[in-house]
């Protein structure tokens, strides 16, 4: 009988078979863990897209983003309107200041125009007063009848001048003042710079001369 030189391979025992077989349960558990880790990694790639905002915090979808942009545009427009409002206030302030200046100027000009009108009216009456004044100085036979009437007219004219704001100046006995008086003659006298005779009464309105008085002035010899 032929004998195998290598001998018959002895069958492995059950324990050896058991030890040499792969650990199926361990491998399966490892594979399951790997698959789970791989799933988590793939899920991590979608974190940004699938991230859930905390409860109560609105999602920033397209509609919300558009509303935010619209709100920002409105805020920018508010800033522009505030700047425009400030500019309009400045312009209004300048206009108010200009108007106040214009009103003051027109008030002054109106007052000056009124004074000039009064002066012209008074100047028109002055020759009448002068004629009356000269008539009163004439010596006539019926002076007793003429004088009272002429004096009444003269006083009436002076009253009218007073209502117009005119003040007579240059009467006899007043101190001579070159601002209001014009000396047409100088004569010797007991006092210097005294008006001894009035040829033509002068008139002034406040600080403004309407007509200088034409007078004769005394001077000590």
UniProtKB/Swiss-Prot annotation:
Per its UniProt record, what InterPro entries does this chain match? GrpE, GrpE_coiled_coil, GrpE_head
Q: Which PROSITE patterns match?
A: GRPE (PS01071)
One GO molecular-function entry: protein-folding chaperone binding
List compositional bias (Basic and acidic residues) regions by residue number. Answer: 8-20
Query: Where in the cell does this protein reside?
Result: Cytoplasm
Q: Name one GO biological process term.
A: protein folding
Pfam families to which the protein is assigned, alphabetical: GrpE
Which GO cellular component terms, listed alphabetically, does the Swiss-Prot or TrEMBL entry include?
cytoplasm
Keywords in alphabetical order, please.
Chaperone, Cytoplasm, Stress response
Q: What is its main location?
A: cytoplasm
Tell me the segments the record calls region Disordered. Answer: 1-43
Return the Gene3D superfamilies for the record: 3.90.20.20, Head domain of nucleotide exchange factor GrpE
Q: Determine the domain of life of the protein's source.
A: Bacteria
Q: What does this protein do?
A: Participates actively in the response to hyperosmotic and heat shock by preventing the aggregation of stress-denatured proteins, in association with DnaK and GrpE. It is the nucleotide exchange factor for DnaK and may function as a thermosensor. Unfolded proteins bind initially to DnaJ; upon interaction with the DnaJ-bound protein, DnaK hydrolyzes its bound ATP, resulting in the formation of a stable complex. GrpE releases ADP from DnaK; ATP binding to DnaK triggers the release of the substrate protein, thus completing the reaction cycle.
Q: Which family does it belong to?
A: Belongs to the GrpE family.
Which HAMAP family has this protein been placed in?
A: GrpE (MF_01151)
Q: How does it assemble?
A: Homodimer.
Task: Write down what this protein is called.
Answer: Protein GrpE
- Which species is this record about? Deinococcus radiodurans (strain ATCC 13939 / DSM 20539 / JCM 16871 / CCUG 27074 / LMG 4051 / NBRC 15346 / NCIMB 9279 / VKM B-1422 / R1)
Q: Which gene encodes it?
A: grpE
